[in-house]
Amino acid sequence: MQRSLVGSEMCIRDSTYTNQEWGTGMERETVFAPTQKPDPKQWLEVAKKAHMKGGIAVVKHHDGFCLWPTATTEHCTRNSSGYGKDVDIPKDFADAARELNMKYGFYVSPWDLSSPYWGKKDSNGNYTDEYARLVFLPQCAELAQYGKDQFEMWFDGATGGDYAGGYGSYTTSEKRTIDNSQTYYDIPNLRDSIHNLLPDVVMWGVGDEVRWIGNENGYSGQTCWSMGDGETGSEYAWMWAAGESDARSTKGWFWDSNLDNEVKTAETLFKMYLETVGRNATLLLNLPPNRAGLIDDSVAEQMEALGDLLDKRLGTDLAKSATVTADCTREAMGNGNYEARNLIDGNKDTYWTTPDGSKKAVIELKWDTPQTVRYVSLMEYIKLGQRIKKFKIETSEDGVTFTKRGGNQATTTVGYKRIIPLNGSTAEYSTDGYMAKAIRITIENSGSCPLLHTIEVF
């Protein structure tokens, strides 16, 4: 999951054709009327140009409309109009992802404003199990059949409350709630059944497998542990739960043909990248298809520009031409060694570390001639946990006198990846950079002996 780093979320719905951010479940199926057959391959091609590793297709949002011909409800593409009748987004999305060698998964909303079973009570006022048994769990099982190579199934936490829906009616709306989503949706059974079908899938929103970072604005905490909750996580939490940050590339989650969709610029998206991927989180960026079932040109242009920025600013690793040393290194054992040169060998399965009990160390990278540097990236060997608590980065023009870099960036955690802008800003690119004949990375505190598998310099 964490090795994916960046992915995309694609939302096309019946609400795309009503210009509403959320539907109500009262929309007629014929409202879903794409002007041509939606093209998931184009969605993923746009994402790939921005160096994204995969995507999650929203195949059922809160309005309950299913973007595949499900057997669980008539509120699906089978009863839509025009090109919509031929739509099977899970199939086309999975096929396209495999062709493009990308990861794929599906978002399915447990809340269903179209189902008469959702929130239904019996004559004694108790919630029935009909929705979970007849609709929700079978829908998830259907989606699992689209491929055992799915990497994530995403379950939104929004549920009931003050938002009114049809719940089986096209003409009148009502408000419904449920008391406990874990029991109502039969989550333990859901987790077990889906993992039996998809052993390698990560399930978001139904347990502790991966966590929401706590906002929808594309940033995580500068301190970010892969355990615990929210933006920062917790060093002391007992279960691994990598942070996932969902964000929008436009004003809303869905395309609105009547509004300025306020497409975010590549520079804004690059800042998001630094504040998520560069802070030990994964970035899930929403790309809403338009009424033609395509990612709009205005979005595609900025995504391609983001890819260009990533190539230009983080594409040439200067560390590969450096000499790297450490003042403290664990002795080789068996066929393995833990030498500092492992940090620049390009192999994510080798790493540098210190002897047991050594929680501090100094690593230096040196060049024969000064280099122009702007970013330093560190990556822990997280197969053995996340350990580093505090570090600092310094540069030297002459290899003798060093100056601390990174501004007010909190150089605390590293995790899978930490990118430090040496000028201290994620928003402002350092045009001039800093001349450096040497870079010093001092690990000042670690939970146990620190382990790093890669250092990159850009």
Which ranges hold each PLM region?
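Single conserved hydrophobic/aromatic residue that forms the stacking wall/gate
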Residues: 1-7, 12
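The substrate-binding groove and active-site-proximal loops of carbohydrate-active enzymes
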Residues: 23-40, 69-88, 121-134, 154-164, ...
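Catalytic domains of carbohydrate-active enzymes, especially glycoside hydrolases
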Residues: 38-62
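Carbohydrate-binding surfaces of carbohydrate-active enzymes
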Residues: 46, 80-81, 87, 93-106, ...
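An active-site-proximal structural segment forming one wall of the substrate-binding cleft
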Residues: 46-48, 82-100, 127-150
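Aromatic-lined carbohydrate-binding surfaces of glycoside hydrolases
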Residues: 59-73, 85, 106-120
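Substrate-binding cleft/loops of secretory-pathway carbohydrate-active enzymes
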Residues: 114-127, 146-149, 154, 158-249, ...
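Aromatic, loop-rich ligand-recognition surfaces of beta-strand-rich domains
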Residues: 298, 310-313, 345-409, 423-458
